[in-house]
Amino acid sequence: MAAEIRLFTCLNDNFGYLIHDPATGATASVDAPEAAPIIAALAREGWTLTDILVTHHHGDHVGGVAELKQKYRCRVVAPHDRNGRIPEVDLRVAQGDVVKVGGLLARVLETPGHTLDHLAYVFDDDKAVFAGDTLFSIGCGRVFEGTYPMMWDSLLKLRVLPDDMRLYCGHEYTAANVKFALGVEPDNPALQARAAQVTALRAAGQPTIPTLLGEEKAANVFLRADEPSVAASVRLKGADPVAVFTELRERKNKS
């Protein structure tokens, strides 16, 4: 049976996610920005939390872990954070590991850059990737702990996933990302189409997530740093993709 995924808002602009296996009743929360919205979403669905899949240690992704662990006695799956910033961890995972949520299988990708410990969880059978703060719709995360080459390599790991894979990211940043991207590629038809879609969704009070990776590959300038047209738009014609990505990210930091 196909996984059931529920999306809701946490904190200010974080997304909360539940992924449920109807065959076994297992339910995972991807990250736990705060406990209350997750508890409410579980109650609405009549589900019980069995797992928390942590993408990285930032407080707006793990702030609800301890309370949820106490309430549900759920398993906490997390990266190898050497500084102990993720509470209540039961299972540490790394690149290539597979996590079971009931009968659902999540393949672990290490995607460092935003933080050194960052992970993405890929549910191949269900065509869903939970990318945390590495890849956003029409954007990417800031590089806080890693390096720009590291972040570019992480984006490439996500870019090779199938076009029909649904992207679930950590924040609702799409409108701001679109505004920046249009300044880089104003004539990109895929970006123009996504911009119109985002405007309509936000006007209706709807989330802009999930999006398809195929759409991101066509419209997300950060995934397109190795495209000659993108390099030319930032006056780096012929430059290495890492240099182009670095310039894009530095510009976005200042926007």
From Swiss-Prot:
It holds the Pfam family Lactamase_B. Binds 2 Zn(2+) ions per subunit. Zn(2+) 1 binds at residues 56, 58, 114, 133. GO terms for biological process: methylglyoxal catabolic process to D-lactate via S-lactoyl-glutathione. Keywords: Hydrolase, Metal-binding, Zinc. It catalyses: an S-(2-hydroxyacyl)glutathione + H2O = a 2-hydroxy carboxylate + glutathione + H(+). It comes from Rhodopseudomonas palustris (strain BisA53). NCBIfam families: GSH_gloB (TIGR03413). Thiolesterase that catalyzes the hydrolysis of S-D-lactoyl-glutathione to form glutathione and D-lactic acid. Zn(2+) 2 binds at residues 60-61, 133, 171. Pathway: Secondary metabolite metabolism; methylglyoxal degradation; (R)-lactate from methylglyoxal: step 2/2. GO terms for molecular function: hydroxyacylglutathione hydrolase activity; metal ion binding. Its EC number is 3.1.2.6. Monomer. Belongs to the metallo-beta-lactamase superfamily. Glyoxalase II family. Its cofactor is Zn(2+). This is Hydroxyacylglutathione hydrolase.
